[in-house]
Amino acid sequence: MTAPVARQGRAGLASLDIIIVNWNTGTLLRDCLGSISQARTAGFRLERVVVVDNDSADGSTDGLEHLSEQPISFLRNDVNQGFAAACNQGAAGTQADYLLFLNPDTRVFSDSLWCPLEFLEQKQNGKFGICGVRHVDDSGAFSTSCARFPTLGIFFGQMTGLSMLFPTWFRSHLMLESECLESREVDQIIGAFFLVRRTLFEALGGFDPRFFVYFEEVDFSLRAVQAGFRSYYLAATTVYHKGGGSSQQAKAARLFYSLRSRLFYGFKHYSFLDAFALALLTLTIEMAARLLAALGSLSLSKLVETVQGYSALFVCLCTKRLRWRS
């Protein structure tokens, strides 16, 4: 594989394309696009905003073509292609120096686009291929912004609750606010705001479409490290992220795809023994813990969602619909 090169030294302003994958997000998409039109674009060229709609049924893309002064392109799929595949689809028709993969349940602020672009443009930052910013919620409080690469030990700590009881010994996958107070190099940027050099994105072949949703950015970030590029988190630049914009509508499906993508990640990147251990823990200890939590909450809907999510996973495993290795 030819190593991607940074953009430094090329003439003219850096250019940016924004890719948004939408699935039944209601008015969130409109708010997201509206915020882009208000963001600072001096110092770079915002070439295109591409919205890939994965067969939404709520009319969330209706009447948005002329919402912004920036050119907006809509790609409408007749079936839900999955998040990773739709991201690749949106990026395929663009040519800018940088790609920003942005969730429709986000809203950017004045410098949300410019600051990470400026960081990646600096010559001394050529080793960084991915950049992200601080995420905030409705109240303005910190929301998950970056993470460490998940190991079998990290997953075990999460499944058993040990990462909450003994966070010093059992670190969590998602980094805590106390770890994100200052700008720093991190393993992984959260995919809701994922700025990447086009050269790196193309060299890695984009996101792995076998991750229908979840873990696609974890996999990409790990492959970027293997190619010699790092991820950087900017603590002083923010973006609003609601979280769960579309997945809140189908919680059983969300659980299934989260577990499925996790297992696929394990079998793709771990040793076979560690991947097998991850699958065994997921299908025993974690399943029991989730069922007990649902029963303890006295929530029938939560119990049903858990049973449905795991049932779908068992069907997927039994029918060998997971292709573990490339």
What is each PLM-predicted segment?
Residues 253-261, 272-326:
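Non-catalytic, C-terminal membrane-associated alpha-helical segments of glycosyltransferases
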Residues 99:
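Short aromatic/hydrophobic "clamp" motif used to bind/position activated sugar donors
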Residues 181, 187-238:
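A short, conserved alpha-helix in the catalytic core of glycosyltransferases
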Residues 35, 53-62, 79:
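A conserved acidic beta->alpha catalytic loop
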Residues 76-94:
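Glycine-rich, basic loop-to-helix element that forms the pyrophosphate-binding segment
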Residues 109-145:
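Conserved donor NDP-sugar-binding/catalytic core segment of glycosyltransferases
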